[in-house]
């Protein structure tokens, strides 16, 4: 039985009937997705989240989208890839990596996101990154691009690009590096193997951290363990949460979308 349903998906992210294949619609779909569906490391037990390659898209659709629990990049961006494909977009999976991800997993095929080609132009689209980043399509271009007070640029490297961001009062920093090499889901097998090794390591007690976030009208909010970060009009504020009750309340607010 095919559970994945385009109209249910569109309604869940507040875009019912938005079936156009154009940049304006794509931008609305991406930002609405980021506002409606959180990034959440808590949506799945790690043992249930190791199937990156042979992902059951119907099961993930129910948990991550229909129930609104969110998930990681390989849940959210893979389902968004399917949604865009079924709407008629030309979509290509891409792989990226962060410095932390390379250190943790030892692979450059870490982060999963998408490239959309519209009228001969390429756009980066990402609905599953757990940190300050672009909330609308980003042109694959050397130009500096501004979104809601933050600036973005793509810096060419020997093996691809470095996506960099600068806030209203911060310096340029790398979000992640990537190439535009088209990917297959099987390319994430190495990451999956690393997940399985992590789960199987009985000496580790830190296998699942609290990492969640979502967008709002003019910014984003993230909680990583006890570090609470808000970005509003490009301005960042960071707090360390020491009170357990406040921590639990913030987790609930980020996941529910109630930013207060």
UniProtKB/Swiss-Prot annotation:
Look up the signal peptide feature and give its range.
Answer: none
**Domain of life, per lineage:** Bacteria
Q: What class of enzyme is it?
A: lyase
Q: Which SUPFAM superfamilies match?
A: Cysteine proteinases (SSF54001)
Which pathway does UniProt place it in?
Antibiotic biosynthesis; rifamycin B biosynthesis
What Gene3D superfamilies does UniProt report for this protein, alphabetically? Answer: 3.30.2140.20
Q: Which UniProt keywords apply?
A: Antibiotic biosynthesis, Lyase
Which family does the similarity line name?
A: Belongs to the arylamine N-acetyltransferase family.
Its name, as the record gives it, is Proansamycin X synthase
Q: Which organism is it from?
A: Amycolatopsis mediterranei (strain S699)
Cite the source lineage: Bacteria, Bacillati, Actinomycetota, Actinomycetes, Pseudonocardiales
Gene name, please? rifF
